[in-house]
From Swiss-Prot:
Entry-linked Gene3D superfamilies: Dbl homology (DH) domain, Pleckstrin-homology domain (PH domain)/Phosphotyrosine-binding domain (PTB)
Name of the featured protein: Pleckstrin homology domain-containing family G member 5
Pfam families listed in its UniProt record: RhoGEF
One annotated GO molecular function: guanyl-nucleotide exchange factor activity
Organism: Homo sapiens (Human)
Domain DH: 336-528
Length: 1006
């Protein structure tokens, strides 16, 4: 019975078990012609005992069930070829999430047709379809393949089909590059197809398909096969019966959304990338584009110009035996030494080639692709860091050190000498400075590369092509990026291998110096990386601290004024320690704090190197806010309490008085003990940091470059000393480099706190040595002097750079006459006194001004010029000892008493010849001073103050070199010993002023 107005379905007989129990999704696609619906209805009416009404009801029930199943006829579309060549019709599966081009590509390759040379039309439409549309929307439709409308193209297609070799025509890509996603389609035809298929114009040519819309859009299952052969001619009738039943699906096909266009652009970029990479494979790797300079440096031009020359320089013989004549006569140890040296040269050349592969294959290709508009989102510097700088430094190292060693061996046919490498490895710290940046950024480069490989299809295709290149030697990009730090850590191993096989003492010293230079640089790199990690950890902790709320404001005005100071900078340097030291997080955890008798709260504490933070967690967030002022670790007294799991923190101020007490309760006794021990360890660690860099004398670590410069100057001056010894000149007259000093107060002459003068007095006594009891327990044993010595000993400068002092060398200690004490650095600036010793007052110095923290870089002090020393030198005496000598109270064999203040000496020792009141003009010529020399008296001061006879003094004056006539000494007045000498008015005035100031200050202190 025929029912008009009902939707017609191709249903199996009602009695079929398959139709009742098996879903059509599990059945294979039907390729046989469909059975006429009227015959099925008649059979069903007979099986239903003639009850047509019940049959109709059954049909309506089946109709409801069929709405939720897939129609097998919508799983495929029919492809007909309207060409002059007879080609069999194909039934192609309409796959979901596949473009039309991707589905048709295997069919066209099998039939030998180039997909880009034909046009695809939908049923009776005259508008070519775009190959980027999704294929599943064409299910149940006819697609016709026609020759393009352009004149002359049809003949080309037919000629390609008739040619026996036409099977290779559609594969336009070279062999080995892999099939692309789909062939390039003419851009103009694609643009026209998009314009024709616009929503405003599609009804003009497709009106017959926009009729009934009774069946909603259904998604066909994805078949397993790529294409199905045509079964019989009945499939054409089946396709005709589908025509008007998929209007909704067909209308959805024309809605070209942004996803479709984005997919098309991605396909275009992939095709363009494959074409570029194929060009690089055929015609060679490109040069770095002139418009794109990596890191804005000029290394690329030099690199391009000298590449051929470098290739020639990097060519090595197969073995070191080809360089040396008579290698058969060498001992076994010499052969092993040559093997070790050759390994150093060979691995260096191989490493330079690896760096060149990274630059030429990966970096230059990437920059050329970016110039073409591909992979522009990739940051080359973030991916490769400063590898070009590393390649450049190794080229310089090879050209200046390695290549000359090889050329010398080739020219002389002699052994490879390890000492020839000393020139380059001695400057290892300054030459290899780019490695510091690369090692610190290497982890970030690796992470960035992994992210690109995971998310960027174009980058993944580019890296896959590059890693398959013959130059890469099957290495991954990650392996190539790890080469620099591996090479850096391999240098000490190679040099130690050379050292073990070397017997000559001079060569051993050179290799040891090279190993020391390399290891110092590696330690410096490790320290930089460790500090960087600590800064990152500290930054992570800082990000968790939300606010600083330790002060409660009483009004809005107070709140506004406080707002400027309510902050805490945990990244600031540790007070009293070196600026290079980074604050570390030692312990963190939750505690229960009790402040007072009743106040209890849950807190979260952070223990750093120098402070303890008490914070409170913010609700619904992993952040905290500071609720108590930071507690300095060195002012905390920690004690455990009898209550299990409790400990007390007493906070002291600068006067060592308690200003706060906090009781903390941990969750267990072990955790409580851990907090107490960690606080003690933090206090010890902070004390060590401040002991290494005491306040007021903080000296940053020397840079490697300055250290190497200092070593060079030291060697040059050693050579000058050797030359001076050969010519009979005393070694004491050659300049010696003292250790470097910063702008800190201890490295310079200590400034007095007033406009006072500092006398530099030298008193010479024969027989005194540096280890005299007065030096050990006298005025030189003050605490400030010990600090100066410890600072000198703990300096980073090598001990060989300190001024060597012999057993008879004297020292001149500067003393602040205003206080009668030695300056803190008086023992660091020892200069041997000249033969013309006299009282030399220093210029008045301005009061101290608080100086800013010392800069991280050290400044080199001007080399101290040493004067020739007399044969018998003695250490300096204090002013008190000098006055005793002036009073005639000492013989040159008796050690002087400990120093006393000048005021005490003036009261205890009567000196009738010295006046402390009145002006020098009033004193006149009768103002004498025992043992005080006249200006320019020269060694007479030494002899007279030590009680030496005047005759011996005259004898020594006769030993002066020619051309230096001694000054004529005035005859002493009658009745005065020859040991007495007169002082000039200026000298007497200075002594008087100094004595007055010292007496005044001493009296004020009492």
């Amino acid at each position: 019975m025929h029912y008009d107005g009902h939707v017609r379905f191709d249903l199996p007989p009602q009695g079929s078990v398959l139709a009742r129990n098996v879903s059509t999704r599990s059945c294979p696609p039907r390729t046989s012609p469909a059975v006429d619906l009227e015959e099925e209805e008649e059979e069903s009416s007979v099986d239903g005992k003639g009850d047509r009404k019940s049959t109709g009801l059954k049909l309506s029930k089946k109709k409801a069930r069929r709405r939720h199943t897939d129609d097998p006829s919508k799983e495929c579309f029919t492809l007909k070829f309207d060409l002059n060549v007879d080609i069999e019709t194909e039934i192609v599966p309409a796959m979901k999430k596949k473009s039309l081009g991707e589905v048709l590509l295997p069919v066209f390759e099998r039939k030998g047709i180039a997909l880009g040379k034909v046009d695809i039309y939908l049923d009776q439409s005259n508008t070519p379809l775009s190959l980027t549309f999704e294929a599943y929307r064409f299910g149940g439709h006819y697609l016709r393949v026609k020759a393009p409308a352009k004149p002359g193209d049809e003949g080309k297609v037919e000629q390609g089909m008739k040619d026996s070799k036409s099977l290779s025509l559609p594969i336009l890509r070279p062999a080995g590059t892999g099939p692309p996603a789909l062939e390039r389609v003419d851009a103009q035809s694609r643009r026209e197809s998009l314009d024709i298929l616009a929503p405003g114009r599609r009804r003009k040519n497709m009106s017959e398909f926009l009729g009934e819309a009774s069946i909603p859009g259904q998604e066909p299952p994805t078949p397993s096969s790529c294409s199905l052969p045509s079964g019989s001619s009945g499939s054409t009738n089946t396709g005709d019966s589908w025509k008007n039943r998929a209007a909704s699906r067909f209308s959805g096909f024309f809605s070209s959304g942004p996803s479709t266009s984005a997919f098309g652009r991605e396909v275009d970029k992939m095709e363009q990338l494959e074409g570029k990479l194929h060009t690089y494979s055929l015609f060679g790797l490109p040069r770095l584009p002139r418009g794109l300079r990596f890191d804005h440096d000029s290394w690329e031009e030099e690199y391009d110009e000298d590449e051929d020359e470098d290739n020639a320089c990097l060519r090595l013989e197969d073995s070191w035996r080809e360089l040396i004549d008579g290698h058969e006569k060498l001992t076994r140890r010499q052969c092993h030494q040559q093997e070790a040296v050759w390994e150093l040269l060979h691995t260096e050349a191989s490493y330079i080639r690896k760096l060149r592969v990274i630059i030429n294959l990966f970096l230059c290709c990437l920059l050329n692709l970016q110039e073409s508009g591909l992979l522009c989102e990739v940051e080359a510097e973030r991916l490769f860091s400063n590898i070009p700088e590393i390649a450049q430094l190794h080229r310089r190292l090879w050209a200046s050190v390695m290549a000359p060693v090889l050329e010398k061996a080739r020219r002389t046919r002699a052994l490879l000498q390890p000492g020839d490498f000393l020139k380059g490895f001695k400057m290892f710290g300054s030459l290899f400075k780019p490695y510091i940046r690369y090692c610190m950024e290497e982890e970030g480069c690796m992470e960035y590369m992994r992210g690109l490989l995971r998310d960027n299809d174009l980058f993944r295709a580019y890296i896959t092509w590059a890693e398959k290149h013959p130059q890469c030697q099957r290495l991954k990009l990650s392996d190539m990026l790890a080469k620099p730090h591996q090479r850096l850590t391999k240098y000490p191993l190679l040099l130690k291998s050379v050292l073990r096989k070397t017997e000559e003492p001079r060569a051993k010293e050179a290799v040891v110096a090279m190993i020391g230079s390399v290891e110092r640089f590696i330690h410096h790199v490790n320290a930089c990386m460790r500090q960087r990690q600590e800064r990152q950890r500290l930054a992570a902790v800082v990000s968790r601290i939300d606010a600083y709320e330790v002060v409660e404001s009483s009004s809005d005005e107070v709140d506004k004024l406080l707002k400027e100071f309510l902050h805490l900078d945990l990244t600031a340097p540790i007070p009293g320690a070196s600026p290079e030291e980074t604050r570390q997080l030692l312990l963190e955890g939750s505690l229960r704090m009790k402040e007072g008798k009743d106040s209890k709260m849950d807190v979260y504490c952070f223990l750093f190197t120098d402070l303890l933070l008490v914070t409170k967690a913010v609700k619904k967030a992993e952040r905290t806010r500071v609720i108590r002022p930071p507690l300095l670790v060195d002012k905390i007294v920690c004690r455990e309490l009898r209550d299990p799991g409790s400990f007390l923190l007493i906070y002291l101020n600068e006067f060592h008085s308690a200003v706060g007490a906090y009781t903390f309760q941990a969750s267990g006794q072990a955790l409580c003990r851990g907090w107490v021990d960690t606080i003690y360890n933090a206090q010890n660690q902070l004390q060590q940091l401040r002991a290494q860099e005491p306040p007021g004398s903080q000296q940053p670590l020397q840079s490697l470059e300055e250290e190497e410069d200092e070593q060079e100057e030291e060697e040059e001056e050693e050579e000058e000393e050797e030359e001076g010894e050969d010519s009979g000149t005393s070694a004491a007259s050659s300049p010696t480099i003292m250790r470097k000093s910063s702008g800190s107060p201890d490295s310079q002459h200590c400034a007095s706190d007033g406009s006072t003068e500092t006398l530099a007095m030298v008193v010479v006594e024969p027989g005194d040595t540096l280890s005299s009891p007065e030096f050990d327990s006298g005025p030189f044993s003050s605490q400030s002097d010990e600090t100066s010595l410890s600072t000198t000993a703990s300096s980073a400068t090598p001990t060989s750079e300190l001024l060597p002092l012999g057993p008879v060398d004297g020292r001149s200690c500067s003393m602040d006459s205003a206080y009668g004490t030695l300056s803190p650095t008086s023992l660091q600036d020892f200069v041997a006194p000249g033969p013309m010793a006299e009282l030399v007052p220093r210029a008045p110095e301005s009061p101290r001004v608080p100086s800013p923290p010392p800069s991280p870089r050290l400044r080199r002090r001007t080399p101290v010029q040493l004067l020739s020393c007399p044969p018998h030198l003695l250490k300096s005496k204090s002013e008190a000892s000098l006055l005793q000598l002036l009073a005639g109270a000492g013989t040159h064999g008796t050690p002087s008493a400990p120093s006393r203040s000048l005021s005490e000496l003036c009261l205890a020792v009567p000196a009738p010849g010295i006046r402390t009141q009145g002006s020098p003009q009033e004193a006149g010529p009768s103002w004498d001073c025992r043992g005080a020399p006249s200006p320019g008296s020269g060694p007479g001061l030494v002899g007279c103050l030590a009680g030496e006879p005047a005759g011996s003094h005259r004898k020594r004056c006769g030993d002066l070199p020619s051309g230096a006539s001694p000054r004529v000494q005035p005859e002493p007045p009658p009745g005065v010993s020859a040991q007495h000498r007169k002082l000039t008015l200026a000298q007497l005035y200075r002594i008087r002023t100094t004595l007055l100031l010292n007496s005044t200050l001493t009296a004020s202190e009492v």
